């Protein structure tokens, strides 16, 4: 599967249960759990245009981040998205862009414990999804995260 070949941990790895216990569930999101949507996001190959199913909706602040992987690879610029609760020793208030942080997200190999700088901040609803890439391969389960403007209803 292409996603696993890229070193992605779509379920968020070891940090996932801790993060999901801390983030606030949205009681009445625009896209409810179980809804089918079309992805407009292009975070990963095969994502844009894929059908997805909403498996969670959370109220938080989403950040794009530039970070240096712990694997020694070159810096990753503009990675979308990590959330407030995936920042090590996070505070309740949103951070400003430019803030330097340590990541506790484990979305991709080398992300956990990486140092980074927040590029953008957006207080929003984020969604966890299951989807099958348009490029083929198996279903990606519990992918974190897409924002409301990155999905649209199935017509």
Q: Which residues make up each language-model segment?
A:
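Bacterial signal peptide processing site
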Residues: 12-14
């Amino acid at each position: 599967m292409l996603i696993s070949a890229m070193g992605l941990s779509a379920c968020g790895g070891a940090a996932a249960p801790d993060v999901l216990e801390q983030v606030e569930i949205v009681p009445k999101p625009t896209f409810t759990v179980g809804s089918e949507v079309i992805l407009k996001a292009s975070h990963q190959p095969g994502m844009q245009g894929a059908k997805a199913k909403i498996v969670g909706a959370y109220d938080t602040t989403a950040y794009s981040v530039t970070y240096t992987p712990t694997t020694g690879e070159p810096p990753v610029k503009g990675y979308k998205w990590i959330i407030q609760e995936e920042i090590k020793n996070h505070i309740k208030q949103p951070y400003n862009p430019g803030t330097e942080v340590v990541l506790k997200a484990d979305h991709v190999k080398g992300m956990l414990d990486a140092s980074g700088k927040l590029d953008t901040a957006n207080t929003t609803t984020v969604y966890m999804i299951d989807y099958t890439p348009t490029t083929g391969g198996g279903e990606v389960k519990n992918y974190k995260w897409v924002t409301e403007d990155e999905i649209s209803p199935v017509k």
